[in-house]
């Protein structure tokens, strides 16, 4: 930091940690213009980085008339190009851009007004008074003559005074070339020139004020010249003898404190391994360097600060790497090409990691040193400064900035703003330092001339070493450049359709027209001055100036260069607009007289860790006490960063590089199996124990008294007994034995299993080598046992249950017992019987059913047993525990489940599946009953005639109706008819009558029909079929229908001697087949309708629609007269046909 009052710089001597030179380019504006600060850059030690800032200042200069008798003083501004500065190891470089414009007017000077034109800063205007015109385009008017031998008038102005300058137009001819600096050109000076209130663009390279300059005593002894440089005043000493104006302290360059910690490339001796996954970011943020308002003033040198706190895992080894990523719109340096990061170090200066920067990816790759092998639990901090990359951001815009440490990202939204030109009438200009080459000692300035493309008359641009205020006044500021015939000046014209980037930085000049040879350039316009005569212009131009500078001691920089645009306004007066750029690089020192600050002394702390066998907290009181190796000791610095070491074989540890007056914390990790001993056991600080954590402040000396002691933690036992509690009272009785092989589990207070064992032959168990604390003991219930009641008596005689808590407090615990008793077994079962009366109750006369399968399932549905009933219908399952079960009875073939739950539980039927719960008792109430369905016998004979029909029976399967046996009687009637058929056959049919007798059998005779039916006695019904015949009647209708067909044949039935056919009709009904019957008419009944009945089957399908027909008279003699039988048969057949056809028609519909 520059001492602004004495203009002297001092250096600090000693170790420098993570210091970077910073170069700021700034433009200061006092009045209407804003302060524009360029870039603050921080690089590795010895590397100089520039920070560009644009500063514009507007000043209202008051000028009063002065008498012609005023002394005329010609001042030539000279620059000491080899200024001497204090020896600064790490200079801070600041660049300041100052713009000014002023119009000279006649004698009575009015206060200049500030105007804004096209969103630009305006300056004051005064009438010209004997001031020489600079390179104005030739005119016929004598007042517009040009004087190329300009002699600058720079006056030192006292603070708080207004300076008035009176000038008169010169009537003499202007020389075409400048004379020596001492020549006068009619410049009258009535008062000191006003001190500009505007400050140049200044770039400040800020370094931590506490960091000393890296100059050793030996270096000073061996190099006296360096010592002389350190105590020698800056070139300000020379300047103090010159009548030049100095910038007021109010416009001095701003200093931006921007720390950055990064490092130089690591030698590739160790294999690289990216360990981003082992880096834990604990805190990171992005902040703005000047004002936290969401706006980055890029030309103000406002930097972006990225801070990151992170932990380095102990698994990280030397040679491993991590990455830090910049946002792609930012860059570490704004005006230099040196992007070398500095080391990441701890507060004592030890290097943790070194880094390299990749410009293409905007990424730093850090490689860890053996620091991570020597220390543990390393916490690090990273603070990076960056600036808007004008190549990526040529114009104002909104950005979302994203930075990342070890791929962990953080973001911030900002708006980027750039400077505006300084404007006075048609004069409008702006400039920046766009590049700094610290090797060649060159600086590049980019100037926008007439960026607003106004109609500017008699345009001249002057480039000057030193400062130019916004109003065009010249002043000596904070630095200088060398402008001579070797200075590179290029001029480019901007086409009407081209737009200048707002960043004021050109990366490709080839896109613009090179008009250098079309303008008049005078590089010797004055001492360290050049002038460009543009004439009348209405286009924008770019001027590129590359000038030399003289570095100070230790490469300090004080580079300042201003520009002024002069035009003739509509009143034929000159209007001025000025702009200044400055780079300052100085060391952060506290000011002073230039003497060397004593080297900062660093201190150490540490000492000893021992095993305190006698636990008294004092070292050496027991011969068995010894040092403890490998104990982890952690040092916490004032900024919160940490590092850890382990004690050596002698129990010793040490931390060095500590600063006086700062406070540190030391923590000792308690080794496994030990406890901290008593603290401060004696008044002797060298012999006591300081405990697990101690805070110490360095007071000008080392502190090697930070000791601590530990003693071995005693171990204890836990356990006792598992026994069979035969009387189930929960108390251990003398005659009750222990239970062997019971599993016991021990858990710590967090629930973690720390041991498992089993009881011995006596039921005893134990766990050993336990520390004080709370434990949980869990007993596993042995097979065939049940836990007894718990907590019934004294702790050492009761049962603690299946789970209990045991506490160890400086003693064994032998009270954790558990008791069990043998679990009783139970039985389940009972009886399956034949419920002959179907009432669902077990009667004394009803017998059991043998060989019924019974299955037992547990609560999960798993089969745990299967058995069959014995000859008495009894069954049972034994050896069952209390619980839920399901009993499943398999229904015997041919039997039907009887009604359930009709009476008392031990006498009723429980159904095919029964859920049962056993609770401490047997259950013999699980019974079930079945009965057999009624079946008709087959007198199969009876019909056997009608057997022929029987087929029809098969129709008659609907016989199953037959159950309505009784109907079947009516069938029998039909039989009787059929008998009549049987007539043809044989009276034996009439037997069938006897069938009819059997009718009671429900004629299952008709069974006889379809014996196939036979099972279906209901078949027998087939008579009932015959019912169904009665159905059949209706069927028979249908039959008869069918008959009817056949009947028409059937008539031939009549042939068929036997009505039986017609009867058989009833069979025949059994189906329209009967057609065929009729065919078969051949009475032989043999139509035994069996034939007919084949077709009958479809009819049987519809038979149940007619099973309500009237029954035929039960059997009778055939003496109704066979003579009439034929006639009636025919009639019935015809009627049946009609009905059948009608019915079919209906069905078809």
Curated annotation (Swiss-Prot):
Q: Please report a single Pfam family linked to this protein.
A: Gram_pos_anchor
Gene Ontology CC, one term: extracellular region
Keyword Ribonucleoprotein listed: no
* Outcome of mutating residue 616 to V: In strain: BM12987 / O24
Function per UniProt: Specifically interacts with bone sialoprotein (BSP), a glycoprotein of bone and dentin extracellular matrix. Could contribute to staphylococcal osteomyelitis and arthritis.
Give the similarity note.
Answer: Belongs to the serine-aspartate repeat-containing protein (SDr) family.
Q: What is this protein called?
A: Bone sialoprotein-binding protein
Organism this protein belongs to: Staphylococcus aureus
What broad taxonomic lineage does this protein's source fall under? Bacteria, Bacillati, Bacillota, Bacilli, Bacillales
